[in-house]
Amino acid sequence: MRFPLEVVDACCKIRDKYNKPEFIIGYRLSPEEPFENGITMTETMALVRELVKKPIQYIHISQKNFFQKTRRGEGIGVERLKVIHKETRGKVALIGVGGLYSYKDFTKALKSEFVEFIGTGRASMLNKDLGILLKEQRENDINLLLDPVHPELYSIPNMLWALCIKGGDWLPPVKGK
């Protein structure tokens, strides 16, 4: 745990050195690993408890499913973000992500009150104007799948488009696959 905390300290010192209080510093982490010897929520929570003492603005939790429940360690059976938010609430903003595509997905995530911010990657790749579609509650206009026949619908660079068509867990779901 010493290394990530020293990296955060170094970033904060540089911000102070150049007198840039507006420079936002955060920490992104994956909360739990599925393998036997992987990181558990116990280790994650120890790190989170130290991070909230630092002058950072956010902690970003990266996971496949926003509502994923803890498998091992602290908080077993409870949503990871809920466990983490108990520690971060009022101290540092928490950003959550994971498998949010539809208007209903985003609404459910917001209503959970597990986080201050919601991030999205794949849904943004599928919808150039996702923020507007969500704000205007245009549920039926939100693309949930990548249409491989119509690349013009997206702002995806050619190399990334080729990867998207092949498919992968970390890419948007593709129609017909």
Where are the predicted features?
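Flavin-dependent oxidoreductase catalytic cores
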Residues: 1-177
